[in-house]
């Protein structure tokens, strides 16, 4: 059960990091290169 819990926490943390990274990369304030044109 401990291994399953660690696996679940790892997957959840991974998806949360993906969501945060995607949100920041799509934010114009965080990516000034999209505002050049």
Swiss-Prot record:
Keyword Transferase: no
Subcellular location as annotated: Plastid, Chloroplast thylakoid membrane
Domain of life: Eukaryota
Xref: SUPFAM superfamilies: Photosystem II reaction center protein I, PsbI
One GO BP annotation of this record: photosynthesis
Phenotype seen when the gene is deleted: Able to grow photoautotrophically only in dim light, oxygen evolution is 10-20% of wild-type, reduced accumulation of protein D1 (PsbA).
UniProt keyword terms in alphabetical order: Chloroplast, Membrane, Photosynthesis, Photosystem II, Plastid, Reaction center, Thylakoid, Transmembrane, Transmembrane helix
Transmembrane regions listed in the UniProt entry: 4-24
Main localisation: plastid
Signal peptide: none
Membrane topology: Single-pass membrane protein
One GO CC annotation: chloroplast thylakoid membrane
Pfam families, alphabetized: PsbI
Quaternary organization: PSII is composed of 1 copy each of membrane proteins PsbA, PsbB, PsbC, PsbD, PsbE, PsbF, PsbH, PsbI, PsbJ, PsbK, PsbL, PsbM, PsbT, PsbX, PsbY, PsbZ, Psb30/Ycf12, at least 3 peripheral proteins of the oxygen-evolving complex and a large number of cofactors. It forms dimeric complexes.
Protein task: One of the components of the core complex of photosystem II (PSII), required for its stability and/or assembly. PSII is a light-driven water:plastoquinone oxidoreductase that uses light energy to abstract electrons from H(2)O, generating O(2) and a proton gradient subsequently used for ATP formation. It consists of a core antenna complex that captures photons, and an electron transfer chain that converts photonic excitation into a charge separation.
Similarity comment text for this entry: Belongs to the PsbI family.
NCBIfam families for the chain: PRK02655.1
Protein name as annotated: Photosystem II reaction center protein I
Species this chain originates from: Chlamydomonas reinhardtii (Chlamydomonas smithii)
């Amino acid at each position: 059960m401990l291994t399953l819990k660690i696996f679940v926490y790892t997957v959840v943390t991974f998806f949360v990091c993906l969501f945060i990274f995607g949100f920041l990369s799509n934010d114009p304030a965080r990516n000034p290169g999209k505002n050049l044109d």
